[in-house]
């Protein structure tokens, strides 16, 4: 079995947890690759994604996502990313020889639409609240449920 782990940055808490999983799997002789958009740690596991979008496009995406996040709901004060734009990275995944894709923290890496285009089995570790809120990474909620606030 060959597993692809996808994470935004290897320095985060999710990235550190991902590395522990990979180290455990490698001890069991399971082939794993760890692809990140931003590589900070000096290790033998994480490799930078070959991400071919021009810098200008990336900057426009970031600006649009920031503006959209501010306009979407001003009552939300936590870190947000709507991930409206994907990366076409799913094409690499679909054309690869990986048997399984493990998504970790994919902010800005894949959109929900991109995830739906992956034709490999997916395991998704919910390292934050984004997969089920659609925009927030974390919200302390202060004992008030999202659905009671009706902010979706």
Label each PLM-derived region with a short phrase:
Residues 1-152:
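Catalytic cores of nucleotide-sugar-dependent glycosyltransferases that transfer UDP/GDP/TDP-activated
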